[in-house]
Structures are given as C-alpha cells and as structure tokens.
From Swiss-Prot:
CDD domains: Ribosomal_L7_L12. It comes from Erwinia tasmaniensis (strain DSM 17950 / CFBP 7177 / CIP 109463 / NCPPB 4357 / Et1/99). Forms part of the ribosomal stalk which helps the ribosome interact with GTP-bound translation factors. Is thus essential for accurate translation. GO terms for biological process: translation. Keywords: Ribonucleoprotein, Ribosomal protein. Transmembrane segments: none annotated. Homodimer. Part of the ribosomal stalk of the 50S ribosomal subunit. Forms a multimeric L10(L12)X complex, where L10 forms an elongated spine to which 2 to 4 L12 dimers bind in a sequential fashion. Binds GTP-bound translation factors. GO terms for molecular function: mRNA binding; structural constituent of ribosome. It holds the Pfam family Ribosomal_L12_N. GO terms for cellular component: cytosolic large ribosomal subunit. PANTHER family: 39S RIBOSOMAL PROTEIN L12, LARGE RIBOSOMAL SUBUNIT PROTEIN BL12M. This is Large ribosomal subunit protein bL12. The keyword Zinc does not apply. Belongs to the bacterial ribosomal protein bL12 family.
Amino acid sequence: MSITKDQIIEGVAALSVMEIVELISAMEEKFGVSAAAAVAGPAAAAEAVEEKTEFDVVLKAIGANKVAVIKAVRGATGLGLKEAKDLVESAPAALKEGISKDDAEALKKVLEEAGAEVEVK
C-alpha cells in the first residue's frame, strides 16, 4: 500500500518547524539536491510581449496586371503617375510604413484585388 500525496501533506503539516528543517536536510541528502532558491532569469524574459501597433505594407511583386496595380498604388499613396509607376517597377518596395493594422489590411486587400503580391510586416 503506497502513501498518497494528501497523506504526505497532512504528515508534514503536523511537524514542527525544527522537524521540517530536518526533513528538508534529509531530502537534500537523499536526492542530492539543494533547497536553495533558484537564480532569477533575465528580466527581459519576464516582460509581457508588446503588441505591434504599426505596420509596413510592402509590394512584393507586380503580378499580371501592372496598370491596375499602378492605379491602386496611386490611389493609396497619392503619388503622381510617374512616381507610382517607378515605385511599382522597383518591387519589392515599401508602399506605406508605420500605419495601423486596419489600414494595412485594407491597403493589402486593394492591391491584391489589382493583382499585386503584398506583404504586411
């Protein structure tokens, strides 16, 4: 018949402080471990992961319909025809940087509908 975890806890609860210290010493010796507190890890690991709030929209490839992509880029960026054409032809290129997630997703949708390959970073 084995002793359950609850029985062990009840047994330890009934011990005096000196008996618990002796029990800890005996367990350290028996199992070859130390009951010393573990060294804290780096503080950066404890910090919460910060949610990204600014995104970049990058034109990866033009696709088959270059004219539609140029029109979409002009509408989204406010660039002139020549500037938009140069930007599209220099793909991969950043179209907009530091915009909200909703704006980035909307821009990505418009450009993909025009036939472009787009990435939100």
